[in-house]
Amino acid sequence: YEYRKKISTIDGILICGDIAFSGDEQQYNSATTFLNEICNALNLDKSHVFCVPGNHDIDQKITSSQMAVALLQKKLDESKSTTEFDLNLGKIFRKPEDATVLCAPISCYNNFAAKYGCSFDQKPTWKQEIAINDTFTLCIFGINSAFISNEHDHKPDQTERKMRISRMQIPERKENTVYLSLCHHPPECWVDPGKILSKKMDDRIAIQLYGHKHLQMIRKTSYGIVVGSGATHPSRLESDWMPRYNWITIDIEFEKEVPTLIIKVYPRVLDDIESKFIPDGSINGEYLNFSLKGRNIRR
């Protein structure tokens, strides 16, 4: 379904992690080739690809064999509170040699992502800005949620170990700026007592995009939307196998000088004969429309 023919400008490609299957260099070579083809088809420069790592971007050969990596991950994983985790992560990133060790399991991801300005070699976040209009800027904000991911992500009973993010990975408010975040693990997969982190995300970020779970989920928050984006290439062994992706458009309209953020999400799914992606028939109409006012869209 060639939706690109219906819109005037395509500004970027957003990837919420699990670009590889096991953090292997050859897998990223394949991903680079694939993204080059998409960029060429959409007339996009590669600087307009935005991505974050997921648990499948972790090279478990490194986490299972390098004691220095294991010790730093253990220190973070055993943090007894969000505040302690913040302090421990901050200490690591203030020492370049420690940051290099912690990020070793995503070294192949970082080599791949550096082409797009989205590596996490010496920092826990990245950000890039795109003008929406003469007044407002879209700040795309990448968050690494896979710092402690390793071969122990699944417990003996097959439940998933929860990941960690830090308050320092959540952006500060900025006038005339609309935040769009990319993070692989959704809030329900975080260690987040009292849901302080997820509430802070809802309070500051207008558009939150997540991966990890292969089922699409879109919900509105008090000040924005959250999109669990499904998967473009899930395992065929999954019982609810459904390859999908989304188009997202962003605009700002003014009503009596009050700015309103207009977001349209166009879900696309693979058709029955696995030939092309088509509009998701489970929603009413071709897209989901959200109009947002309030603290995440203001001058």
Predicted regions and their residues:
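Conserved beta-sheet core of the metallophosphoesterase superfamily
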Residues: T135, P187-T260
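A short C-terminal boundary segment appended to hydrolase-like catalytic domains
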Residues: I250-R299
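Core catalytic region of metal-dependent phosphoesterases/phosphodiesterases
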Residues: Y1-K95
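Active-site neighborhood of phospho(di)ester-bond hydrolases with catalytic His/Asp-centered motifs
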Residues: D11-D18, L44-N55, Y179-E188, R204-I218, ...
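Short aromatic-enriched loop/helix-cap "lid" or pocket-rim segments at secondary-structure transitions
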Residues: K61-Q66, K220-S222, S239-D240, F277-I278
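Short catalytic/ligand-binding loop motif for oxyanion handling, primarily in non-cytosolic enzymes
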Residues: F21-D24, D57-I62, I148-E151, C189-V191, ...
